[in-house]
Amino acid sequence: DAQSLTYPCFCSRKDIQAAASAPHGNTGVYPGTCKSLSASDIIVAARQKSPAIRLRAAAAIQSEVGDFVIVRSDQLFAYQLAVTVDDLDQGVTEVIRGADLVDSTPKQVYLAQLLQPNRRKIDYLHATLMLDDQGQRMSKRDGSVSAIKWRQGGGSAEQLLAHLAFTAGILGVSKPINIVELIEMVDIHLISSKLSSIY
């Protein structure tokens, strides 16, 4: 039942970081501080602040992801739950996304199994992130060149595709290519070894 799978958590990010930095702490994994609170402890804590709701992770993934938030303390659904429900609702069977989201995958796989245990498993592939000349992740917030700026600077769509495909290891040389040519030559099974991971 849902109550045995979840519990309220009153920990702040600061509390969790402090626990993770303690000797023998597991960085990034919730230490379970609120997991065994009694009913009276929960009532007292709830008078001070609204709790988040954590899902008890299965033993197989406990050390990897720990118990994770599915409802935030502001009562909004957390990303992990929202995206999993959305994927299931849309009938998604394959997801290709950046390697920066690989830590979310076991959580979403676990949630999907709980919500729809007889459904076909979603396959995940995590693509290598695009890096700039200094080896830093390309992102708009860090001022990386956008596609619009690329075009304004005289770059063509074919040159941009070539640059991205070359950076990802799909092309051996960075020579202009159009989208139709690129689609025809891309086989996910052949390039999967150049991508970060398949889950």
Predicted feature residues:
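Active-site cores that bind ATP or allylic diphosphates and position pyrophosphate for catalysis
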Residues: 2, 8, 13-140, 146-151, ...
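Non-catalytic terminal extensions that flank enzyme cores
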Residues: 43-44, 136-138, 146-199
